Structure formats: structure tokens, C-alpha cells
């Protein structure tokens, strides 16, 4: 009986690993495709069905603004020690750079103690390869570096700036856009108009840099860049983010802010749950 029970347990573990690897990892954080918290489909949420049935309309948009502001206020209320300045050659920058990937790492139960996100075992390496290829369209070193460069130099900082400066959503549209694209653009434009007087484009730094840091660690784990290169990239990302943001709380709030703009662009009405998962991860880290 004990042997049979153990076999049943082992079979269930193997079945779960095989059936969820691509489904779960293929829905993780990607540019305009995959900023979905890890393994949401494995979590039981009482309101999931109701939320996905909601029609994406102006009322839902306004409700999401309220949810965003309430969630950001929740993070603002958390205690955090005063930031300590580091010298340029301080070894603490290496740890700081790794922690920039903290929110995504927390959602995926990745290791934050060093550069490697997981143990180097075939099943985990295949999961990370699948994630990066399917969600980000990255298939090697060149693609990886191009995406990191894009996030660090343009990303949602530039996108939010363009949407904020446009006098109408039509300025951001062209003849190739279908109706869904136009609705997506209009939602993101309304978001930018709602918050442009409160948050500058630089406030998107946490959203852009956090994802770039995670890609850096994934790329290093897969051997697409060396650990020395990864440390250098994370140092550069660290210098950029501290120019724009002044605390880990603000970093987490930036992640929420950028994440909601992405959800609005995608027309994903699960945004409220998404904000909650991001806030929970940030709370754990803080």
C-alpha cells in the first residue's frame, strides 16, 4: 500500500510538471504579451469567472483606476528603511541589481540569493527557454540584448510619454490598425491623460528596468550572456533606476502603474487580480 501510494504521488508530480510547464511558463512576463503573474491558472480565485466575463468599458476603466490608486496607497503605507547611498564601486550594487528582478522572481519562486534563478537541471532550463521564446520572442543572445536595450532606453517610459503628449488618441493611430487596435490605443491614451499631471514618464522606470533585470538573469541562466556581462548590465540598469525612483516602494508602485497600462493596451479585464498579485509580491519583498 505504501509503495502504491508513493507511486501515485510520483505520477501526479510528473503529470503536473508535464502538463503545466508550457502553459504556465508561456504566460509570464513579456513585452505586450506576457506580463501575467506566474501560474495564475493554478490559483483558485473565487471571482475569476466573473472577472473574465466583464465587458471592457469606460466604467471598468474607472474602476481599475480606483483599484490602482488603492493598491499603490497600500504599498505606500508599508514601512521601509531610509535609503543608503552606495559608492560607485560598492559590492552592494550586485545584490541591488539582482533585487531589481524581485517582483517577477517572487511570483515565479525564483532564487534571489545569486545570479542563477534556478538550479541547472534540464526541466528548469527547458521551462526558462520556453518562457523567453514564447512570451518575449527571444531566441538567443542577439535578441536578448536587443530587448534589454529597448527596455532600458525606450520601453514604456517612451510609450507613456508619447501617449501623454498626444492631444487625441487618433494622433497615435494609423491606417493599418483594426478596431481592436484603435480601442486599445484609446484606452492607453485615456490612462496617460488621467495620470500625466501626477506621474512623469520616468515613473515607468521600475516597470521597464524590473523586466530588463529579469531578462538579464534569465539570459545568464541560459548561457546566452556570461555572468560578468550580466553583472555589468545589472549595474547599468541600477544606475538608471536610481535616477528616476527613490525607494523600493516607489519601484513597486511603478510596476503596478506600468502593468495596468499594459493591461489596458491588451484589453485584459483580469487587471484587478493582476494588480493584487503584484502588490502581494512587492509586500513580501518589502
Q: Language-model segments: which ranges?
A:
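Polar/charged low-complexity regulatory segments
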Residues: 2-227, 231, 235-286
